[in-house]
Amino acid sequence: MKIEDKLVTSVISGLKALYGQDVPAAQVQLQKTKKEFEGHLTLVVFPFLKMSKKGPEQTAQEIGEYLKANEPAVAAFNVIKGFLNLTVASATWIELLNEIHTDAQYGIVSADENAPLVMIEYSSPNTNKPLHLGHVRNNLLGNALANIVMANGNKVVKTNIVNDRGIHICKSMLAWQKYGKGETPESSGKKGDHLVGDYYVAFDKHYKAEVAELMEKGMSKEEAEAASPLMNEAREMLVKWEAGDPEVRALWQMMNNWVYAGFDETYRKMGVGFDKIYYESNTYLEGKEKVMEGLEKGFFFKKEDGSVWADLTAEGLDHKLLLRGDGTSVYMTQDIGTAKLRFADYPIDKMIYVVGNEQNYHFQVLSILLDKLGFEWGKSLVHFSYGMVELPEGKMKSREGTVVDADDLMAEMIATAKETSQELGKLDGLTQEEADDIARIVGLGALKYFILKVDARKNMTFNPKESIDFNGNTGPFIQYTYARIRSVLRKAAEAGIVIPEVLPANIELSEKEEGLIQMVADFAAVVRQAGEDYSPSGIANYVYDLVKEYNQFYHDFSILREENEDVKLFRIALSANIAKVVRLGMGLLGIEVPDRM
């Protein structure tokens, strides 16, 4: 039983005994005592002054005396104005640690068969280039969010919508056709997504050269862009694709398959995955159908040019285009089509879209349209909106010199982690295979933690060098502390020390030890809050605060060399449960923690 729950029950009994009145539990406010005051938990007594008919200090004194006499969990109390500060007994903290120790998945709530089904969409790449730094933040946030939502007792389906059609895809197809000379991932030794991305860049290069040449002949920029033979060929290819031209479709399928193989490798390295992948080529026609259905029902209207629109002025928005006059779709049409397919595939209770904040308006509109079209979860659609991520100027430029590929970023992080770990002696005594694995865990952990510790709504700068520091609020600092605790536990096991199911309760704990138990116990509430707020950063910063406190404890107190056997057992058990919570917390963020370093 939580200490807070125990104290709330005793306060209710005390108010009945002292003032003869029943009080609902919701009226009893307990909060953590401020650091400058003595105590662990503070009771606000102002709500009880009417029934006590006394001043706040006297009321607090009377309640404190009652609790001290009748509730074994209260060791002492002090009164500051209208606040009653309660010091929890050491035996009660040890009892709480015993409860946490018996729960291998402390703080994690499993879904039962009646749990709500939450679908989370993230990644959403285009099949004309590799995943880049922006996708890294998206994937890491989406994956962590899915883990956190699942840890709060929900069923979760992780989905991805791949933008696999359109003019941008035709650009890389046409460039490969013109300049590729039959090059394949196998013949070039390149990942498929990188190879296709190179042809997208090649298209852009040739197109710009064409435009410049036409402008030299006297055309304006707009005229030159419209007259570009290369761009017109790409448009023709798109028309052929829409018409189902077998040759164009075969080329499209071949090049997309190269990209998917590349994406799969990137996702695997990054440690993210999906339960279901949707493709825009399958959803956009469904969207058209659903929009026409909405038109027939009078939800939408048609303009003279044949385009279909939604009038959202009643919702405080404007008119929104859903189908162009030539019948071609827009992004909104695709999202409606994808929603239709998803609704047919799964009994969704809530849908969360992990998409950058430049799409805030789009999702506001989508929510209204889905609701109009009869999707029950339309109103409860969540747009998990996040800010942009950049690199410090001049760092890690990609081959194109503009965007940083996810693969290059991860490779550089792993290489830097290996170099830094070797310099600090963290890989001493390990085999080559073990050292490589530690470098991978630390490099990716540094990347993931640095991104996830930041409030998702904020724009951020990812600093590779800063992220691999073994000191401060970083992934490697947390990972090293975890490895340190695992080393303590290994030595304890080698010495034949076994943590009992019930720890001796006859020891006096220090303030630091009580504080650490309180922090470990907080993990369940932190996971719950992160689920309510959709906040991976809440988990990240909690774990950092916990390991920072543990490091101070590790330096200030003997653990294995402690002479009092009961105290030694307690400190080993405390260390084991801190390691457990760190592993669970980092696991929710998709970050591995090494057993040794």
UniProtKB/Swiss-Prot annotation:
SMART domains: Arg_tRNA_synt_N, DALR_1. NCBIfam families: argS (TIGR00456). It catalyses: tRNA(Arg) + L-arginine + ATP = L-arginyl-tRNA(Arg) + AMP + diphosphate. Keywords: Aminoacyl-tRNA synthetase, ATP-binding, Cytoplasm, Ligase, Nucleotide-binding, Protein biosynthesis. Monomer. A motif ('HIGH' region) lies at residues 125-135. Its EC number is 6.1.1.19. Belongs to the class-I aminoacyl-tRNA synthetase family. The keyword DNA repair does not apply. InterPro entries: aa-tRNA-synth_I_CS, Arg-tRNA-ligase, Arg-tRNA-synth_N, Arg-tRNA-synth_N_sf, ArgRS_core, DALR_anticod-bd, Rossmann-like_a/b/a_fold, tRNAsynth_Ia_anticodon-bd. The gene is argS. One of its GO terms (cellular component) is cytoplasm. Transmembrane segments: none annotated. It comes from the Bacteria. This is Arginine--tRNA ligase.
